[in-house]
């Protein structure tokens, strides 16, 4: 990805870009420092050859009385999807004990202030794939602001991410120092292709694991 001096779209991109109905590509991104994690979205209009900063995803880190208040340093590693032309959504990794969400009605040019969902998140990476009308989210459903990255599961939504239900467990092994079991299954990447989910993730920080889940019979 070429990035010139006038194109400061670089950053720790973890999750995949998406292509919108209008042909543009959006890449989830963030600016990270010890003081603040600030999520944003970058845009490509030339098929991914170049990207530019498009818009920040606003966070409420000051008004503790508001329902969208986000404790901690902020949010990173958004995962994106488009539910209808121009309607784009993001789920965010946080230190707040929950996955947060933000929505855009104008193709990612502006975003709502991120707000908490019912999905637990202990500051671990997440990723989402779309198959038809269903969303599949890979995450560690662990409460708290820090903790074991186990189990690693896939959850399914059929109402555009308003609610999620258990779908599959990819790995579940509690931490056990006596037997060298670390229980670290994290940083998932998930795509839906040909009626199947394809997922990779870190296995105890020593190797990369791959899982395939068949959604329908045959290949499409």
What name fits each language-model region?
Residues 1-220:
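Asp-box/BNR beta-propeller blade signature and adjacent active/binding-site loops
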């Amino acid at each position: 990805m070429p990035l010139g001096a006038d194109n400061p779209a670089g950053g720790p991109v973890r999750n995949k870009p998406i292509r919108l109905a209008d042909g543009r590509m959006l890449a989830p991104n963030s600016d990270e420092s010890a003081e603040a994690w600030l999520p944003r979205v970058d845009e490509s209009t030339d098929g991914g050859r170049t990207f530019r900063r498009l818009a920040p995803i606003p966070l409420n880190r000051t008004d503790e009385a508001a329902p969208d208040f986000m404790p901690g340093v902020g949010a990173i590693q958004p995962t994106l999807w488009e539910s209808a032309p121009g309607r784009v959504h993001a789920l965010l990794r946080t230190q707040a004990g929950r996955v947060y969400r933000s929505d855009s009605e104008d193709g990612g040019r502006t975003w709502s202030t991120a707000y908490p969902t019912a999905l637990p998140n202990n500051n671990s990476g997440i990723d989402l794939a779309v198959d038809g009308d269903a969303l599949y989210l890979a995450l560690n459903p662990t409460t708290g602001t820090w903790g074991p990255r186990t189990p690693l599961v896939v959850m399914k939504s059929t109402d555009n991410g308003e609610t999620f239900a258990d779908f599959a467990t990819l790995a579940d092994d509690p931490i056990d120092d006596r037997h060298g079991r670390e229980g670290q299954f994290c940083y998932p990447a998930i795509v839906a292709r040909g009626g199947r989910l394809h997922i990779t993730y870190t296995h105890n920080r020593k190797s990369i694991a791959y899982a395939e889940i068949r959604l329908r019979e045959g290949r499409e």
